[in-house]
Design a protein with these regions (language model features):
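Catalytic core segments in nucleotide and nucleic-acid processing enzymes
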Residues: 1-133
């Protein structure tokens, strides 16, 4: 199961019979969260894996953390790593110190430390739509 923050990226993802793509449009609503939690319970021990792909920014980090906390505790980031960040850095947007301080102050799960470090080292963020180029 792959949750995708941005509609353009969701629409461009290729179909794979063994994968369910879910457009998250940012944060899931309470009803959407309940549906996804029920789906997780129905799948039980069938070996389903959970991934989320998002903007490489503060919002993307927060959405991932929300999914991990409220829906899929074992969710993994997809294309939210150092390699992806530097591949698309040319499309990045410079951020001011106030924004970077919010990122700095956020306790992220281990799987997003690399992304947090990239944002803080470069001072920029990348919208997921940039990855369509």
């Amino acid at each position: 199961i792959i949750t995708v923050e941005n509609k353009a990226n969701f629409m461009e993802m290729s179909y794979d019979e063994g994968t369910l793509l879910v457009y998250s449009h940012g944060f899931f609503s309470p009803k959407e969260r309940l549906f996804l939690k029920n789906l997780r319970e129905c799948l039980g021990e069938q070996g389903a894996e959970y991934f989320h792909t998002s903007d490489l920014d503060y919002g993307g980090i927060r959405i991932f953390m929300n999914i991990k906390e409220k829906i899929f505790p074992d969710v993994k980031p997809l294309a939210m790593d150092e390699e992806t960040f530097f591949k698309y850095q040319q499309y990045g947007e410079k951020r001011d110190e106030k924004y970077l301080q919010k990122v700095r102050d956020t306790d992220v799960p281990a799987e997003l430390e690399e992304l947090k470090d990239c944002i803080l080292k470069t001072g920029c963020t990348i919208e997921q739509e940039s990855m369509l180029f």
